[in-house]
């Protein structure tokens, strides 16, 4: 037996061999098949020599899981989790353990993809529909989205919607009440500048004095005051002003709904419905509007349709509004949102039910009443005379109060004008009220919580005016009234999970989506209280662990990208695009070239690119691609020269969206630079760059990084995501700042793009762990293995399907595109048929019809083993044989396993199945693999047209699920 060295024995838990799917023997077998001697040899065959890095990354060695956990545990301990009363949109909450364990920490929920294949996503679609129902019930409006990124960006989306739908077409002013949260105003101003809107800020009642297209109000406001806006809203709407409201979701359990006051749009954060603060995120925003505005809504909307058997089925509705179809004409660039967190919030509402929510909200309000009564009894003056959970105090010795608060390990809100704010939440206890009295008043105040409570009960609370007390019922649907025991809740969550296909069942080979392993060790720290329970606006000296983690992650990303600086703030890839384009815009403005507003975008680009360019106030000019899928250099040269005076930038993806490393990438960069433009390199395909090349080395100026793709943050069924941007030094002064927390950059005065200074900081430990565990060598090997897996799949499938684009040496990058158009022409079988048939084989379909209609784009990632790759290949080969039977006339074009896919249990139990020209076994057990491990779609193919023509986006009768 060969003896191992001690060093080798010490590497027993190295993460690298857990993350990469094929073991060394499988890799060699695959290399032999594709015709390469080694991973380095394959890399040399694929990546153009001119852009290959000539040095290794300088991140450090890979390490074991135990070592990585120990290190990040040390960082977590540097965070001081004080009791937070800061509020401002972020509140303490108690995550029900049944949700924490069965949803937040469950790969069946967090590794799924956006439900573009609804037949295998009915579980989370139902959970999201519940979220929409909660949003509609509490706001009193007609139609809700499936989630937006955060409250502040939802405000910006509300402003954009207001302009789209307002009948005051000549108006260009958006009014913002001066008592909204400052971070919300910050993000709104950033967006308004790009659109050329004027933002007027003033007291709410002054809104009627301006010619507006829209207005924004906070309910309750930043000081805690609750205002009845009914008359004001009526007056504004009579002037064709679109009224938008930022609302607190917990307060709406007790308060009159904004919809009942006449609001057009209501939005806010669902964070306090069972989602930790996470130093700023991720959290789902709710967004609800009147039915008449449905075509102008941003983001995804879940609707009810029917399948081919006539059964109710859920799907994403009205997708023609979205960026992947409408491109620069889309309502929004929203792509990845916050579905996992929306699901948590919806389950929170289901678990507590209307009565439980009312108890929680009433307790918060009662404690606030007690706190206010005690302070007023001692002569303390309050700014507000109505409240739900927040009081604002004036006339205090701020320095003394702050000192006592810090000594008691609590954080209050201290405004610049000397006002001290206190916001209570679900976690507040009696003892906390006593401690607050001690901090605010000092020792010896003599106040007694029980006595104050008895006084309030006897006299009646006046904190919520009678006219603002909610009178209508909420959450009356049976779903919110039958799962209050943990047993029932656990089983309900499991029933929904079992309807969905996620990475814990099989490979998800979606091209341009990088559905790699989200390792358990990477996910563990996210639930730790030291990371989960930090308020984003706490004093930074309490967040030393977070600060160090963000600094280390940023330095690693700088090294990986070849840029000079990184901004962590954008909380999705689309937001990263927007933030990067804003930096370019501000750079041109600083040079006296504000007229540079044209963005060149290849016709193959992802739909978010033109949508983001439009958000940044740019005009899109599309450049052509040649027959090989590369940017047409002659067309680019001509258009760059034509618009040279006004050229702002080009947005290009690398490797291209066609899955190849374009040889001319540096020439493309040079052409744009020669005409005064900047190069935005979309980081969607960064998984094919890490350790081999980099955007900065190639010649780009700015990129966003999808941490939820390349750096292992899970997709969550449609979010969360993170989209930090890397920039060259000349753009660094122009990245996003923040009005509340100064990140310590030159860009402090730049507007924000997200509500929190570091975006969804709560999931940054995932990417930190991913990079720390893999190290320089592991990151490079992951990229090389992704190339190997893609080329292995490509070569295997090329024997059965045409491969549309290949690069040098007949290779692809990390993904390949198979062309199904000849099959459709010969047999009538479509890419949709093949996608749905893959469900019967236990697979999620690859990306359909992007970047070319009638194709499938396959990205296997480095995490899939040869065994799983072969299972997928076998399924595709088997499907090709089925297509051949249709081509030969053995099966009718309108009655075959592909046309009828996917197949359900109901199908094979139906006696009428006997009339089909294929057997039940062919329908549901088409391969040996699924006979022993079968995933069952729960609905047949869904009728999208019916769903959009009969739009219904609320909970359906419970009998439909029984």
Swiss-Prot record:
Q: Which UniProt keywords apply?
A: Oxidoreductase, Pyridoxal phosphate
MF terms in GO: glycine binding; glycine dehydrogenase (decarboxylating) activity; pyridoxal phosphate binding
What EC number(s) has UniProt assigned to this enzyme?
Answer: 1.4.4.2
Listed under GO biological process in this entry are: glycine decarboxylation via glycine cleavage system
- Gene3D superfamilies according to UniProt: Aspartate Aminotransferase, domain 1 (3.90.1150.10), Type I PLP-dependent aspartate aminotransferase-like (Major domain) (3.40.640.10)
Name the coenzymes or cofactors required. pyridoxal 5'-phosphate
Q: List the disulfide bonds.
A: none
As stated in the Swiss-Prot or TrEMBL entry, residues carrying the post-translational modification N6-(pyridoxal phosphate)lysine are: 709
The GO cellular component terms are: cytosol; glycine cleavage complex
Q: Which reaction does it catalyse?
A: N(6)-[(R)-lipoyl]-L-lysyl-[glycine-cleavage complex H protein] + glycine + H(+) = N(6)-[(R)-S(8)-aminomethyldihydrolipoyl]-L-lysyl-[glycine-cleavage complex H protein] + CO2
Keyword Oxidoreductase attributed: yes
Q: Which family does it belong to?
A: Belongs to the GcvP family.
Cite the record's note on assembly: The glycine cleavage system is composed of four proteins: P, T, L and H.
Q: What does this protein do?
A: The glycine cleavage system catalyzes the degradation of glycine. The P protein binds the alpha-amino group of glycine through its pyridoxal phosphate cofactor; CO(2) is released and the remaining methylamine moiety is then transferred to the lipoamide cofactor of the H protein.
Task: Write down what this protein is called.
Answer: Glycine dehydrogenase (decarboxylating)
User: Which taxonomic lineage does the organism of this UniProt entry have?
Assistant: Bacteria, Pseudomonadati, Pseudomonadota, Gammaproteobacteria, Alteromonadales
* Designated gene of the protein: gcvP
């Amino acid at each position: 037996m060969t003896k191992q060295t001690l060093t080798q024995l010490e590497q027993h838990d190295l993460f690298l061999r857990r993350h990469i799917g094929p073991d060394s023997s499988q890799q060699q077998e695959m290399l032999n098949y594709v015709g390469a001697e080694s991973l380095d040899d394959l890399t040399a065959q694929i990546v153009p020599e001119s852009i290959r890095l000539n040095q290794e990354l300088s991140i450090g060695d890979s390490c074991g899981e135990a070592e990585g956990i120990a290190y990040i545990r040390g960082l977590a301990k540097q965070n001081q989790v004080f009791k937070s009363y800061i509020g401002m949109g972020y509140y303490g909450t108690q995550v029900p353990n049944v949700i924490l364990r069965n949803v937040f920490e469950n790969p069946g929920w967090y590794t799924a993809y956006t439900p573009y294949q609804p037949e295998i996503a009915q579980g989370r679609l139902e959970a999201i529909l519940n979220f929409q129902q909660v949003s509609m019930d509490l706001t009193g409006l007609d139609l809700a989205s499936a989630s937006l990124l955060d409250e502040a960006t939802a405000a910006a989306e509300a402003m954009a919607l207001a302009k789209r739908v307002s009948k005051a077409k000549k108006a260009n002013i958006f009014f913002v009440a001066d008592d909204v949260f400052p971070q919300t105003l910050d993000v709104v101003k950033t967006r308004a500048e790009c659109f050329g809107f004027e933002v007027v800020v003033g007291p709410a009642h002054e809104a009627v004095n301006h010619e507006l297209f829209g207005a924004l109000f906070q309910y309750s406001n930043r000081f805690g005051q609750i205002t009845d806006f009914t008359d004001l809203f009526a007056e504004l709407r009579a002037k064709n002003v679109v009224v938008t409201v930022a609302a607190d979701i917990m307060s709406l359990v007790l308060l009159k709904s904004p919809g009942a006051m006449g609001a057009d749009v209501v939005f806010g954060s669902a964070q306090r419905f069972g989602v930790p603060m996470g130093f700023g995120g991720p959290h789902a925003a709710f967004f609800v509007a009147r039915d008449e505005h449905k075509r102008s809504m941003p983001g995804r909307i879940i609707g009810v349709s029917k399948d081919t058997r006539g059964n109710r089925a859920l799907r994403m509705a009205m997708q023609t509004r979205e960026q992947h179809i409408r491109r620069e004409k889309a309502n929004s660039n929203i792509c990845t949102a916050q579905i996992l967190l929306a699901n948590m919030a919806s389950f929170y509402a289901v678990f507590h039910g209307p009565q439980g929510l009312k108890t929680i909200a009433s307790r918060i309000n009662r404690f606030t009443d007690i706190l206010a009564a005690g302070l007023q009894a001692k002569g303390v003056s309050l700014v507000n005379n109505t409240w739900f959970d927040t009081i604002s105090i004036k006339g205090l010795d701020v320095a003394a109060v702050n000192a006592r608060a810090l000594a008691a390990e609590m954080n209050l809100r201290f405004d610049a004008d000397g006002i001290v704010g206190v916001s209570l939440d679900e976690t507040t206890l009696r003892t906390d009220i006593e401690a607050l009295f001690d901090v605010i008043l000092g020792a010896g105040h003599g106040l007694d919580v029980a006595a104050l409570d008895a006084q309030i009960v006897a006299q009646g609370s006046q904190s919520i005016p009678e006219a603002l007390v909610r009178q209508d019922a909420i959450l009356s649907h049976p779903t919110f009234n039958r799962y209050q025991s943990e047993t029932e809740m656990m089983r309900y969550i499991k029933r929904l999970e079992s309807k969905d296909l996620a990475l814990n069942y099989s490979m998800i080979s979606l091209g341009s989506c990088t559905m790699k392993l989200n390792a358990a060790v990477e996910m563990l720290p996210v639930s730790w209280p030291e990371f989960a329970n930090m308020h984003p606006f706490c004093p930074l000296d309490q967040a030393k662990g977070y600060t160090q983690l963000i600094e280390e992650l940023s330095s690693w990303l700088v090294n990986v990208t070849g840029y000079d600086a990184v901004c962590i703030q954008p909380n999705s890839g689309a937001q990263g695009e927007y933030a990067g384009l804003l930096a370019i815009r501000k750079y041109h403005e600083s040079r006296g070239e504000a007229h540079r507003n044209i963005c060149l975008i290849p016709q193959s680009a992802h739909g978010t690119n033109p949508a983001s360019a439009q958000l940044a106030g740019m005009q899109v000019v599309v450049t052509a691609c040649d027959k090989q899928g590369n940017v047409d250099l002659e067309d680019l040269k001509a258009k760059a020269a034509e618009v040279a005076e006004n050229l702002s930038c080009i947005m290009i993806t690398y490797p291209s969206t066609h899955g190849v490393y374009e040889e001319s990438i540096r020439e493309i960069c040079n052409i744009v630079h020669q005409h005064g433009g900047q190069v935005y390199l979309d980081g969607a395909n960064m998984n094919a760059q890490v350790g081999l090349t980099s955007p900065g080395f190639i010649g780009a100026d700015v990129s966003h990084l999808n941490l939820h793709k390349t750096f292992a943050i899970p997709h969550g069924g449609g979010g969360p995501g993170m989209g930090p941007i890397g920039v060259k030094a000349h753009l660094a002064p122009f990245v996003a700042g923040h009005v509340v927390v100064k990140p310590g950059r030159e860009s402090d005065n730049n507007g924000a793009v997200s509500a929190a200074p570091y975006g969804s900081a709560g999931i940054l430990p995932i990417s930190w762990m991913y990079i720390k565990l893999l190290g320089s060598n592991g990151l490079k090997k992951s990229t090389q293995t992704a190339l190997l897996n893609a080329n292995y799949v490509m070569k295997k499938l090329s024997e059965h399907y045409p491969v549309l684009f290949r690069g040098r040496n007949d290779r692809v990058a990390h993904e390949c595109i198979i062309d199904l158009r000849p099959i459709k022409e010969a047999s009538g079988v479509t890419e949709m048929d093949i996608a749905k048939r893959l469900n019967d084989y236990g697979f999620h379909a690859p990306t359909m019809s992007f970047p070319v209609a009638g194709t499938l784009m396959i990205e296997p990632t480095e995490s899939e083993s040869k065994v799983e790759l072969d299972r997928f290949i076998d399924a595709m080969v088997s499907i090709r044989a089925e297509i051949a039977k249709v081509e030969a006339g053995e099966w009718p074009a309108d009655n075959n396993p592909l046309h009828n896919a996917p197949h359900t249990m109901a199908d094979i139990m139906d006696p009428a199945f006997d009339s089909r020209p294929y057997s039940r076994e062919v329908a549901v057990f088409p391969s040996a693999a699924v006979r022993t491990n079968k995933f069952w779609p729960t609905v047949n193919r869904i009728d999208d047209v019916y769903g959009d023509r009969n739009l219904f986006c609320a909970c359906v009768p419970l009998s439909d699920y029984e």
